Structures are given as C-alpha cells and as structure tokens.
Amino acid sequence: MAAAGRRGLLLLFVLWMMVTVILPASGEGGWKQNGLGIAAAVMEEERCTVERRAHITYSEFMQHYAFLKPVILQGLTDNSKFRALCSRENLLASFGDNIVRLSTANTYSYQKVDLPFQEYVEQLLQPQDPASLGNDTLYFFGDNNFTEWASLFQHYSPPPFRLLGTTPAYSFGIAGAGSGVPFHWHGPGFSEVIYGRKRWFLYPPEKTPEFHPNKTTLAWLLEIYPSLALSARPLECTIQAGEVLYFPDRWWHATLNLDTSVFISTFLG
C-alpha cells in the first residue's frame, strides 16, 4: 500500500508539472491556475454525503444541525461585492505590501512565517507538491490583521445563524491547488468558499480518524482513504464558490483545495 501510494504521488506530481497553466481572470477572479492538474488527478467525491439546504430557517438549523451534524448552506447571504474585492488583481492592489503571517499546513501548525502578501501570491501560491509534508508547506489562513484588512472584511456578510454564548471571529485564507489542512478539531463554525473549490472530510467527535499529523490531506486521500471500509469513511463533500459549510463543535475535519481557493471562515468561539 505504501509503495502504491508513493507511485500515485509521483504520477500526480508529473501530471501537475506537465499540465498546470495559469488561466485568464474571467469568472475565477484571476486565481484559476490548474489546467488539468489536480482536477484531473484528484476529483470531487463520487457522492456528496453532507446535506445541502437552500434558504433554511434558523429554527430548522438549530433543530437539525447546530449540535448534530454538518450541513451545506446555500442562498443565505449575497457576497458578490466581497467576491469582487477578493479577485487577485484587487487584493494585490489593496494589500500587496501588507505583511501576512503564514502557518504550516499540518495538524498543529506550530511554525509561523511573515512575508509580504504579494510575495506569497506570486512566489508561494503554487500547486502543492504531492510528495511534500504538511509541516513543510506554508499556508495563508487565519492570523489576519483585522485593522489592516478592515476595508475588505467590512463587506463580508457572514451566515446569519449564531449559537447562544458564542462570538463570531473571521479567518480569511488563500491556498494553492492540492493544499489543505489534515484532520483536526475545534469549536463550531462556518466556512465559505469565495473562489475555487474545497473538498471536506468530516468525522463526529467520537470517531477519531486514522492520519499522520505531519502528512498532507492529499497524501491521506491517496494512501489511507482507498483502504477504508465504506462504514469507516468520513462524511465528505466539495464546497463550491458561494456555498457555506457548517461544522458542529469538536467535529474532526480535513480540507483539500481542488483549485487555488479563496475562503473565509466564521468561528463561533
């Protein structure tokens, strides 16, 4: 299994290097960067196992999902202005010189690196090398300077649902195709995709997944996932641009960006 996994990683890397191209801005805000790339080698799941709900009421949310299971929410907010502001061109023009803090893309994310946002976008925001470790991969997510980025965040409309006794906190991120964060857990929250696609894998609190904290989600998907019995597989779904995933308190989750992705989470702490 390990040898097969390594061969799969090598093949995926070769495919990436051969076919990755940068596409014009169009409807992807200038972030589209994966001709065939990861879309050809690691696709969306065969069947989404997380419910999608459009125009759900607060009462329905609290009764069926808030403390029980994840759900994908559609049509609750209009973030078209925020999306336009998050285009590659607009973000570089507004925040290119700002210093951003990067974290390693592993479960514990101990290492932090500070550098200009433009340098991250132009030099580090590349498709993930499938053979690299999570603790060697730098990832822009969280650690946002809300004072410097206030002109952007003030235009975001978060999901309108709240849990009693919690306070919302934003976490904004941009990551390359094939990147992601391996399994971890924390409090409840919402995660919205602005550009790109993000594949999620989720387990309930009592079901600890098999994973290595320093290996990437991509490595887990290629090496561990195929050997899982159907009963041992996680809930999974690919979140499209404009959709919001809600995850309850202490649910294990891992993410995999299928494209260069721009996203924002609202954590309920």
UniProtKB/Swiss-Prot annotation:
It is found in: Endoplasmic reticulum lumen; Cytoplasm. Residues 1-24 form the signal peptide. Disruption phenotype: Homozygote knockout Jmjd8 show no obvious phenotype. However, the number of capillaries in muscle tissue is significantly reduced. PANTHER family: ARGININE DEMETHYLASE AND LYSYL-HYDROXYLASE JMJD (PTHR12480), JMJC DOMAIN-CONTAINING PROTEIN 8 (PTHR12480:SF21). The keyword Endoplasmic reticulum applies. GO terms for cellular component: cytoplasm; endoplasmic reticulum; endoplasmic reticulum lumen; nucleus. The lineage of its organism: Eukaryota, Metazoa, Chordata, Craniata, Vertebrata. Pfam families: Cupin_8. SUPFAM superfamilies: Clavaminate synthase-like. The keyword Zinc does not apply. Glycans are attached at residues 135, 145, 214. This is JmjC domain-containing protein 8. It comes from the Eukaryota. One of its GO terms (biological process) is regulation of pyruvate kinase activity. Functions as a positive regulator of TNF-induced NF-kappaB signaling. Regulates angiogenesis and cellular metabolism through interaction with PKM. Gene3D superfamilies: Cupin (2.60.120.650). The gene is Jmjd8.
